[in-house]
């Protein structure tokens, strides 16, 4: 396991970057493009299906060299090797971090030690589960798996939360055009009963199957929703004339309409799901890194095993790039270090992700969990405080909707917000605009290109004056530019492209975690809130008097109880 001898901001490389930032603070992107005629080609890279242009970022060649010097000083290459080799880099939970193993090709071998004289054949285990997932998906899609009344399954409802929901829900929406077998995925996550009610409203119980996704099968929100779903199923099947009385009837119904994604076989059985219908994953896979594991079962059912394997191919291409490319040509490294540059040296407080694709609408929310749950830490690996800003705050909406909502702040606000623009050359859906000839996708992409140009280069007072703008309006219409963006283009939004995009950001998160000296693979901040909620539940239900330990919480619960119907 690599060791970091000092905190990041005390290194010589950090100090050099601070000096560089001070010396170049007034540099304009206009100047950089003028001084470096080949800047665009010099700073554009390709990995798998992704074409990545970094040229509109606020940095020059020297700055990039200094950032990579910092990466080396922090041991990034050693940490990268440790992760891929299966070392326990998740030190607070003493676990390996092997989400990259989930997409190992079938012809690759990979094992890790699990004891003094034992090894686990990780590659074989992964492909065994993928094989079972493939068989299950084929059974659903062919109609050989049927509900208790003999109806084929048309609706697959994933019940999970966090990483057991955000990943497959995002991917299912993004890969909508690949759902050709008549199976529609749905997703329930929130403990708010409106979620389960709204999702199940209008579904045919006889053709609905539920996937209960919980590693431990103890997640309170997921189990509450699973029981609510079974009550809905039994009620609707009873209305259809099905016998739902007695343990045997309920067991038969559950066997036909419920499967589990979990590691807790005993608890899965207690719920009534046969363990032969349980799809496992491992403690070396964190929830937010698990969409390509059995957590993606509902996705595989919807898009089919072949396209799911293409999804994994996209991940693996970026994994290989990240693992083998030198830092100077390594896209996740460069993008991760640019995030550190903006956060720690230029004072950026958030990072926008702007996919110009309605199908990618949930991608920013997915990245919020990936980045903020991973790097939202204030303690280093050795238990000492992080003394510099850490953890990028990700947010965003699809274009062009965002242009009419928050782009005003990006263009003329006082906050520096680096932004990633994600676009696709060829659409799955296109239509003709109002003029009867122009492609609507071409209109979308003209906005895509225009926004990155205006953010970078703006429009100054002299240019406005030449256009005849009234003097009193010129200050209001000046677009300062110098807003940094990264542009990611792909030929089409395919399963492989989506897998590559997800892996790109996974490795960006890893890079930044190494620089800040934090564990990107635990989430203790989530755990305390769960415990507090369980402790307060008796007071919220009225079974006990509230004694939370602070007057605000006690008074709020009292108000809630007073007005609860």
From Swiss-Prot:
Example of a GO biological process term: glucose 6-phosphate metabolic process
This protein's encoding gene: pgi
Top class in the EC scheme: isomerase
Ranges annotated as spanning the membrane: none
Cellular component per GO, a single term: cytosol
Family (UniProt): Belongs to the GPI family.
Location(s) in or outside the cell: Cytoplasm
Protein name in UniProt: Glucose-6-phosphate isomerase
Enzymatic reactions: alpha-D-glucose 6-phosphate = beta-D-fructose 6-phosphate
Superkingdom, taxonomy of origin: Bacteria
Major localization listed first in the record, in broad terms: cytoplasm
């Amino acid at each position: 396991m690599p060791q970091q001898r000092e905190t990041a901001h005390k290194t010589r490389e950090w100090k050099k970057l601070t000096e560089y930032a001070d010396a170049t603070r007034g540099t304009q992107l206009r100047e950089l493009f003028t001084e470096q005629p080949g800047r665009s080609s010099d700073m554009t890279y390709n990995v798998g299906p992704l074409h990545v242009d970094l040229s509109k970022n606020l940095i020059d060649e020297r700055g990039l060299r200094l950032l990579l010097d910092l990466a080396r000083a922090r041991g990034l290459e050693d940490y990268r090797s440790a992760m891929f080799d299966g070392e326990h880099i998740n030190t607070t939970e003493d676990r390996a971090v092997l989400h990259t193993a989930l997409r190992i090709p079938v012809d690759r071998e990979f094992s890790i030690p699990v004891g003094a004289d034992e090894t686990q054949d990780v590659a074989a285990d992964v492909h065994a589960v993928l094989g079972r997932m493939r068989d299950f998906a084929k059974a659903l899609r062919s109609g050989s798996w049927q509900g208790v009344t003999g109806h084929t399954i048309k609706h697959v409802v994933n019940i999970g939360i966090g990483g057991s929901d955000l990943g497959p829900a995002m991917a299912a929406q993004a890969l909508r055009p690949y759902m050709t077998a008549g199976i529609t995925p749905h997703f329930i996550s929130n403990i708010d009963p409106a979620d389960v009610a709204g999702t199940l409203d209008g579904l045919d119980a006889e053709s609905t199957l539920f996937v209960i996704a919980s590693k431990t099968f103890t997640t309170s929100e997921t189990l509450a929703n699973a029981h609510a779903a079974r009550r809905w199923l039994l009620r609707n099947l009873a209305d259809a004339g099905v016998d739902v009385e007695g343990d045997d009837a309920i067991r038969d119904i559950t066997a036909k309409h419920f499967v589990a994604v979990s590691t807790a076989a005993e608890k899965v059985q207690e719920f009534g799901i046969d363990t032969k219908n349980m799809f496992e994953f491992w403690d070396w896979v964190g929830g937010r890194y698990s969409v390509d594991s059995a957590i993606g079962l509902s996705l595989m059912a919807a898009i089919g095993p072949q396209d799911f394997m293409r999804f994994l191919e996209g991940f693996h291409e970026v994994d290989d790039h990240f693992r083998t490319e030198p830092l100077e040509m390594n896209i996740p490294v460069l993008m991760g270090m640019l995030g550190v540059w903006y956060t720690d040296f230029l004072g950026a407080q958030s990072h926008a992700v702007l996919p110009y694709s309605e199908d990618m609408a949930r991608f920013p929310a997915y990245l919020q969990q990936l980045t903020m749950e991973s790097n939202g830490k204030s303690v280093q690996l050795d238990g000492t405080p992080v003394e510099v800003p850490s953890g990028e705050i990700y947010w965003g909406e699809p274009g062009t909707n965002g242009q009419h909502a928050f782009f005003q702040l990006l263009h003329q606000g006082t906050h520096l917000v680096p932004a990633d623009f994600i676009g696709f050359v060829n659409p799955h859906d296109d239509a003709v605009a109002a003029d009867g000839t122009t492609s609507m996708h071409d209109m979308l992409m003209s906005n895509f290109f225009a926004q990155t140009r205006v953010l970078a280069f703006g429009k100054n007072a002299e240019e406005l004056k030449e256009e005849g703008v009234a003097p009193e309006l010129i200050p209001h219409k000046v677009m300062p530019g110098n807003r940094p963006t990264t542009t990611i283009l792909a030929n089409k939004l395919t399963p492989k492209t989506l897998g590559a995009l997800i892996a790109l950001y996974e490795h960006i998160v890893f890079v930044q975690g190494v620089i800040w000296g934090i564990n990107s693979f635990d989430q203790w901040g989530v755990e305390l809130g769960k415990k507090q909620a369980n402790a307060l539940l008796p007071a919220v239900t009225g079974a006990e008097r509230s004694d939370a330990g602070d007057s605000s919480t006690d008074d709020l619960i009292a108000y809630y109880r007073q007005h609860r119907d």
